[in-house]
Amino acid sequence: MSRLEQRFAELKAEGRSALVTFVTAGDPGYDASLQILKGLPAAGADVIELGMPFTDPMADGVAIQLATLRALEAGQNLAKTLQMVREFRVDNQATPIVLMGYYNPIHRFGVEKFVAEAKEAGVDGLIIVDLPPEHDAELATPAQAAGIDFIRLTTPTTDDARLPRVLERSSGFVYYVSVAGVTGAGSATTEHVTEAIARLRRHTDLPISVGFGIRTPEQAAAIARLADGVVVGSALVDKIAQAKDADQAVADVLSLCSALAEGVRGARR
């Protein structure tokens, strides 16, 4: 059983949803970013998505684009992101880490080398936003062969004809993007999310995590009553943008994570 399967199975047994947190690797700098990464599990993160900075983050909203820019300006690259996971794994073997981003940096790094190093570093899954199932052979197939889950994004515009193709080779969990568009955009209604989850469940047994537009503990709790996982990214990244220095960035991200975790954990009581 993979770390992701195990985590979702444990939480299902506990009768609660997972808090899935997204931060960009290297934002606001390597050391502070590593501190955030190491602090997230104790602050209540059940799964961590770590963004791989790329110069053209087309699916991301302003908050994550700016985070990417800060990270790149601080010298972050894919090798350093993998090193960050290695350093995280020294103290934490339990929390799943999913790398999220675009195919270009992986292609430049070399797919075979990337898959081998990601596996060795302790990466559990990949979300590659610009690689549709038609390109499985390029990365999804070798990643899954190495035991790394390949997590698919589905959206309100993924129709019933397309959905089975998208979900066919998915593993780990399904990431439902509750608002069509870029990250951090407005939030979806619970009615819409309820319908979307019911539709996805007709096509897959994988856990379903819902993200995009979730910013507060109250919103997180509302989604936690419906989905297997609640993904929060832009709200955490905004804390880094607003902080006066790296120490405040670390403290504020972890503080918001704790509040979100409280919302998620209390949702089904």
Curated annotation (Swiss-Prot):
GO cellular component: cytosol
Reactions performed catalytically: (1S,2R)-1-C-(indol-3-yl)glycerol 3-phosphate + L-serine = D-glyceraldehyde 3-phosphate + L-tryptophan + H2O
Annotated catalytic residues: E49, D60
Pfam families for this protein: Trp_syntA (PF00290)
InterPro entries xrefs: Aldolase_TIM, RibuloseP-bd_barrel, Trp_synthase_alpha_AS, Trp_synthase_suA
Transmembrane parts of this sequence: none
CDD domains registered for this protein in UniProt: Tryptophan_synthase_alpha
Pathway this chain belongs to: Amino-acid biosynthesis; L-tryptophan biosynthesis; L-tryptophan from chorismate: step 5/5
UniProt entry tagged with the keyword Ribonucleoprotein: no
Keywords: Amino-acid biosynthesis, Aromatic amino acid biosynthesis, Lyase, Tryptophan biosynthesis
Function statement: The alpha subunit is responsible for the aldol cleavage of indoleglycerol phosphate to indole and glyceraldehyde 3-phosphate.
NCBIfam families given in the database record: trpA
Protein name: Tryptophan synthase alpha chain
Organism: Pseudomonas putida (strain W619)
Protein's gene: trpA
